[in-house]
């Protein structure tokens, strides 16, 4: 009798435990498997049309051989819907869509997408994406894909942080001047950014790297994308010369060349900015000599020699009182002026007007 009562007490408990275990097993069966995440790389997305909008693209390697990209933008408008894509080539070159990254919600500034292939079905892994020749565009809206709110080079096109900036001085128009900055890419190529002040709205200004120094002049080696007069900006990928010779970041630093920015395609003879680059860059070391008047007491000036990276020099003769239209030859002679001597070196003539 006592045994039966004990069984009555334990039987409901046993059945209850079986039901709980059964429910627990059912829950485990319906839960999706968790995908682990491994290495990650973050790329910067710079502002384009709106200087307040910028962000990052975090690329994540998943354990199941898929890739997740998390886009995070700051200051996107509430309610905005911003399509994003990975494109082929660099941002400076432009290219077709490789991978669709979904929509960045303006309210959160975020978008997350996981994939294992390009839009055309070509498989891609995390490692392949780190070496990909591409860039990311985030657009204003599906109806305005032409307006970009953020952009950044990725993969082999990522910038290393190494850069070199050259000054571009004014030529025909004293209010136009600026800089040319070359930034190294992971693949050894370079992003060239020309930034000019004082360019006219609507102006289109061709630019080139020429052979030799500016004072010597020379043929065109490399063609930049034209400078937009409204923004004063030009961006160009630097990978090869016009003759298809390889030409990357390290080559820029050593080139025997100079940059010319022209007024327009129809007036290449008028220069708006110019600067020596590469081995012709000036080091900042200089020496100035006085040139006293001789036959005409109102004409006098200076001769300044500025050292170049390659050890050569830029000689600038500056005279006051020269007549408009005058052309005045100049030379370095042997010995002292009081002794006199033969010609050792010939300068380019002094332009009397300037």
Residue ranges and their predicted role:
Residues 24-354:
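N-terminal leader/targeting pre-sequences
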Residues 18-22:
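C-terminal motif of bacterial Sec signal peptides marking the signal peptidase cleavage site
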Residues 2-11:
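Bacterial N-terminal signal peptides that target proteins for export
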